[in-house]
Swiss-Prot record:
Protein task: Presumably involved in the processing and regular turnover of intracellular proteins. Catalyzes the removal of unsubstituted N-terminal amino acids from various peptides.
UniProt keyword annotation of Nucleotidyltransferase present: no
The protein's name in its UniProt record: Probable cytosol aminopeptidase
Amino-acid positions noted as binding Mn(2+) 2 in the UniProt annotation, renumbered to this chain: 264, 269, 287, 349
Organism for this UniProt entry: Thermosynechococcus vestitus (strain NIES-2133 / IAM M-273 / BP-1)
Keywords, alphabetical: Aminopeptidase, Cytoplasm, Hydrolase, Manganese, Metal-binding, Protease
């Protein structure tokens, strides 16, 4: 698919499908320029159809019409943007996704899109529209053999953005960002017999070779030498070797900020001896969603090459399996900072792997650490499927992440680090247990992770809900969403300016 901007006036564009987005009105929509010119060329047909359908431009509504055979446009699509006061970049992304999916269903080879940008910068609008199109049209059919699954993939061939001026740089940036999102999606979508800890390590090495990053892979023995007892305790039941992945992006020139991103990398989570049951185990290939997003972000930075920053991408990759070597409930592990952990639930394993990864990250002397993990079902209970939980020991870091998420439409909600709740995680035989009581489960998980960060500004993102969707939603398709690659890229690039 080719994305482009052209100076052609909206009424002069010709092709298979022209999509026009309009704001909501109190009554039936009355066309204004430049659409009145188009309506005049159609002898008033457009306004007539709007009146018949009582189209008001409400969000989520659309009106598709086939035009006269001799007209240079084959079809015209009106899409509602909703209230003008609610208009933002995310509205553009979601509207663009609706248009792109319609073009594919209608088998339109050429698609013209006329979307307003109001007070938004034209470059930002072009990037948001392009992101919506690319992500909506991404279809992961790698494991399908039926040709029917691929018959619509060629559509549309060319997408033209109208009324935004020349925006080649914005479209290129959108494609590069979406490349990272799609990598994250496809890592999450692939089954655990395809994406293993070895696969994640190989992916990191490929990214390093392609984009000029540096990759360091620690094997089981290396991790043992560093005292990573928590990570290796989880890994000991699997027949597959664990891989501790350290990928680094260093910008050209002077580095002003050093950041570590730590992603949970459980390529399959059976729950261990606290075995998951039917209804909870089938989708546990997605338990490496944090690692997938970290690698997706690395891919984007390798292409954008923002100045002034050094970013460390860290993943403790393993499976959580059952075998004669598996962790028992009640076992005590020693993390690499010397703290001891009584494992009272083997299905709370992600925090154990993250514990050693956080200690490792802090020893790098970074200015901030952000970990992201499909950590708790409790966070989904609290915030639902579309919002991630955010915990931080640093207000400035939390605000910066929130600002980036607002621009990208990937929602976070800040949650409290209520230290009193950690009292319930204290162990009679070790420094702490790995889980607390049933209540406030996402908060106690964050408090557990905080024990492995001494002084560095740190944020924890529990992405268990939004990393996966069962249904089409905006520009997200069923399965992995690639959340929150775009937010991380936005935040990291803001540090380089």
């Amino acid at each position: 698919m080719q994305l482009q901007t052209v100076p052609t006036a909206i009424p002069d564009w010709s092709g298979d499908l022209l999509a026009i987005a309009v704001f909501q009105t109190e009554g039936t929509l009355t066309l204004t320029d430049p659409y009145t010119t188009l309506d005049q060329r159609l002898n008033g047909l457009l306004q007539e159809l709007i009146n018949e359908g009582e189209f008001q431009g409400k969000s989520g509504t659309s009106l598709l019409m086939r035009l006269l055979p001799n007209f240079p446009l084959k079809k015209l699509l009106l899409v509602g943007l909703g209230n003008r006061e609610d208009f933002n970049l995310e509205a553009l992304r979601r509207t663009a996704a609706t248009i792109a999916r319609t073009a594919r269903r209608e088998r339109a080879k050429t698609l013209g899109m006329a979307l307003p940008h109001e007070t938004l910068e034209a470059a930002d609008a072009a990037q948001a529209i392009a992101e919506g199109v690319i992500l909506a049209l991404h279809s992961d059919v790698r494991f399908k053999t039926d040709p029917e699954a691929r018959k619509l993939l060629p559509y549309p061939e060319v997408v033209t953005l109208l009324g935004l001026g020349e925006q080649t740089a914005a479209l290129t940036r959108a494609q590069q960002i979406c490349d990272g999102v799609i990598l994250a999606r496809e890592l999450v979508n692939a089954p655990a017999n395809e994406v293993t800890p070895v696969t994640l390590a190989e992916t990191a090495q490929q990214l390093a070779a392609t984009y000029g990053l540096t990759a360091k892979i620690l094997e089981r023995e290396d991790c043992g030498a560093l005292g990573m007892g928590a990570f290796l305790g989880v890994a000991q039941a699997s027949d597959l070797p664990p891989k501790f992945i350290h990928l680094t992006y260093t910008s050209p020139g002077t580095v002003h900020r050093k950041i570590a991103l730590v992603g949970k990398g459980l390529t399959f989570d059976s729950g261990g001896l606290n075995l998951k049951t039917q209804g909870g185990i089938e989708t546990m290939k997605m338990d490496m969603g944090g690692a997938a997003a970290v690698l997706g972000t690395a891919k984007v930075l390798g292409q954008l090459k923002p100045p002034g920053i050094e970013v460390h991408f860290i993943i403790a990759a393993t499976e959580n399996m059952i075998s004669g070597r598996a962790l028992h409930p009640g076992d005590i592990l020693t993390a690499s900072n010397g703290k001891t952990i009584e494992v009272n639930n083997t299905d709370a394993e992600g925090r154990l792997t993250l514990a050693d990864a956080l200690v490792y990250a802090e020893k790098l002397g970074v200015d901030a650490i952000v970990d992201l993990a499909t950590l708790t079902g409790a966070c989904i209970v609290a915030l639902g499927d579309n919002i991630a939980g955010l915990w931080s020991n640093n207000a400035e870091l939390a605000q910066a992440l929130q600002k980036a998420s607002d621009r990208c439409g990937e929602k976070f909600w800040q949650m409290p680090l209520e230290n009193k709740y950690f009292e319930a995680m204290k162990s009679q035989v070790a420094d702490m247990k790995n889980t607390g009581p049933r209540s406030a489960g996402s908060i106690t998980a964050a408090l557990f992770l905080q024990q492995f960060v001494d002084h560095t500004p740190w944020a924890h993102l529990d992405i268990a809900g939004p990393v996966w969707t069962e249904k089409e939603d905006g520009y997200n398709n069923p399965c992995g969403t690639g959340y929150p690659v775009r937010t991380l890229v936005e935040w990291l690039c803001s540090l380089s300016s």
